Amino acid sequence: GRIPTRDNLHDLFNGLAWFAFPQAKARLNAMQARALKKASADEGRGPLRDAVTIFDENGLVLACSSDELAQALRRFDWRTLFVERRTATLMQTEPWAIGHGLLEKLVRPYKAITAHALIVPVDDSYFRASPQQRRTTIDRLVADWLDNWPFFTARDLCPLPVLGLPGWWPDN
């Protein structure tokens, strides 16, 4: 298919997100279209459309094989995630930026960049797969999650200060 874009980084990154995560992006697009069709002008966006928009713009998928690290993220326990369990975070998680607005922010990084992260449980074998296989797996898992969670709200996403992620920023 074709992806309409304007001449700016925001649309370029949206196009790249479509190429990298076609199943997940298609689900997000379909969910937004359904929410738009249902919504009346008086209601505003509503919780589903809010969540879809936030994730589409600022989403990050965190593949995670550790319940302890997933819980640390849900508790906003940055010390555990980024300092005390730094090696485990490097070995048992893999972040995938899916939000095109997030990618645009990362062109000129600043300390306070915070993604809206969807934690996707994976087993240890995930980390032995090739990067292409892992990306394809993440695309499928996110698409499946979106298909099977009709009550998606922004509360399903965890704030994640991305420059705190081990390996994402030279000053870290």
Describe the residue ranges of each PLM region.
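Hydrophobic alpha-helical segments and helix pairs
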Residues: 1-40
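A contiguous, surface-oriented mixed alpha/beta subdomain in the mid-to-C-terminal portion of proteins
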Residues: 33-172
